[in-house]
Every structure is written in C-alpha cells, then in structure tokens.
From Swiss-Prot:
Belongs to the Ves family. It comes from the Bacteria. It comes from Escherichia coli O8 (strain IAI1). This is Protein Ves. Pfam families: HutD. The gene is ves.
Amino acid sequence: MEYFDMRKMSVNLWRNAAGETREICTFPPAKRDFYWRASIASIAANGEFSLFPGMERIVTLLEGGEMLLESADRFNHTLKPLQPFAFAADQVVKAKLTAGQMSMDFNIMTRLDVCKAKVRIAERTFTTFGSRGGVVFVINGAWQLGDKLLTTDQGACWFDGRHTLRLLQPQGKLLFSEINWLAGHSPDQVQ
C-alpha cells in the first residue's frame, strides 16, 4: 500500500507547456513500460493528449471547467465533473477547455492486452475485491483505510488484496479505480 497527498507530490511539466502531471503510481513500480499507471493532470491550455500505443485511458474531470475531447472521426465528448470517460490512448485526442478555465483530471491507463480498469465514484463505505490492484483519491470527506485517515486530495494505491474504505462523515466522495487482470495475467507474474 502506498499513500499520497496531491499537494506534496512532485510535478512534471508537459513539453508543450499546456499542463502538468503528478504521477500517483505505476505497475510494475518504477517501470517505464508499465501495465497500468495512475496520475493527476492539471490542464492550463488546449492541446493533445500524449500517445500511448496499446493502452486504454480513462479520464475523470476532478475540478475546473468542462473539457471537450475530440478525436478526428471517432468521437466528440464533453468531459463533465466526476464522469469517467474511456478511449484508446493510441489515437490523437485534442482537449479544449471551456471558458478558458484550467481543469484537473484523474487519469488511469492500462495495457489493453494485460488488464482493464474500472473507475467509479464512491459515496459510502465499501470493500475492494481481493487480488486486484486499485487507486483511491478523496474528493471530499474523511475516509478510513486501515489505520490511515484520508481527507481531500489524499489517496492510496495498492497492487493486490482486499481493503475497506470507511466513510467517517455523513457525506463524502472518493474516486476509486479497480484494476482487473485479463485471463492468463496476474500481478504475481510481473513483480
């Protein structure tokens, strides 16, 4: 289990100067050729997403203005807050900010031939499935994960095991991404 606080994470500026990324975790850890990766991006200007052949990307707008995603003849999609949207990461996708507002989004990328991610918003206590990786990011409220208290802009990632996230207040939201391994693959094979 790895814990993080977005306010304390290192920031990598994009080459095109249109935004920045805070990498949460990759699996396998510290590998450039990852099977899955979670990150948070701040987007300050219109531009294209980086290409990642053989990967699927799920983007969830966390804050800021809506974002229009365009991919040639494939789709035009308005990304709205807390509504995950998946697309192939090997296609050119342009992001256009609405009303010139900076946006922040959560990204999970998975290698299509190895694993698949599912992203959802939780508003109550829940337990994750065993033997699956995952990431949680607190949008608001206070959540208990084991002996750790997680609050706004904090989270955790893990590579396997069952974990209970307990909401400690009447209301709260967190983003939860679960990694499912495809048949013939498991985290044990690559660690």
